């Protein structure tokens, strides 16, 4: 159930990514794949995103793009292979996957004002620990609370 929920969440993140990038970046998916140039420290984000853009970007647009690209990165991190090797949800690896998802949702909300979490909570509820009385939705809400408390 967890993988299905995260796949649905990734779909929503990707949808917002395309909406934000449409008409502003030459090739949004190629830019996403080349984002490693920023992550590795090879390039600074403002210069890099301007290279990807089909228009001259202002500071506010650059900030939105920075958050959206970080959300895309977190959406990829949700699928780290270590999250799927263990039998129980109540381990650090699946929790990290859910935390990455929550952080991506928070970044999307910061960038666009859209809350893409509403449809995902019921999906996350279906992913339950068999050892503890917790669900992936519990982890998600905790992570969102941390984002709102410490990052807002």
Predicted stretch roles:
Residues 1-152:
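Catalytic cores of glycan-processing enzymes that make or break glycosidic bonds
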